[in-house]
Each structure stands twice: as structure tokens, then as C-alpha cells.
């Protein structure tokens, strides 16, 4: 197995059209210590990227 990665404080954007998936990812990532920004589509994500400067983007 690989080493555990410390995500504490990482800014993560989750892009998905499913509210259930966005919220599930948010719960998991917040528990891992991440700051989470949610977007429901690419247009929403583009509007938020400039303001939040995420370290990681999941889509």
C-alpha cells in the first residue's frame, strides 16, 4: 500500500451534476481536513475557480 497523503487544508473543487455525489464527496473531504468548493457544471466551476483557486479539482 502507498503512503497516506495529508489533505489537511487543501482546497478541493468537486464538479458533478448530481447533488448526491457532490454532497457525499464534500462530507468525505471535509472529514479529511479539506476546504471544499462545489460546482454543478463546467460553467459554474469556471465562475468559481478564479475566486477560490483550488489545489485539486475532481469532476
Locate predicted features:
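Charged docking surfaces used in two-component/phosphorelay signaling
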Residues: 23-31
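Non-catalytic signal-transmission and effector/linker regions of two-component phosphorelay proteins
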Residues: 1-13
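Short acidic/polar segment at the start of the alpha1 helix of CheY-like receiver
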Residues: 18-22
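Acidic active-site catalytic centers that drive phospho-/nucleotidyl reactions
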Residues: 16-17, 55
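Acidic, metal-coordinating helix/loop segments flanking the phosphotransfer/catalytic sites
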Residues: 38-56
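A generic structural motif
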Residues: 33-36
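Active-site T/S-Asp motif of two-component receiver
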Residues: 59
Amino acid at each position: 500500500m502507498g503512503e497516506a497523503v495529508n489533505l489537511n487544508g487543501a482546497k478541493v473543487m468537486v464538479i458533478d451534476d448530481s447533488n448526491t455525489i457532490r454532497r457525499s464527496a464534500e462530507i468525505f473531504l471535509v472529514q479529511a481536513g479539506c476546504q471544499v468548493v462545489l460546482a454543478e457544471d463546467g460553467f459554474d466551476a469556471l465562475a468559481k475557480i478564479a475566486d477560490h483557486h483550488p489545489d485539486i479539482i475532481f469532476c
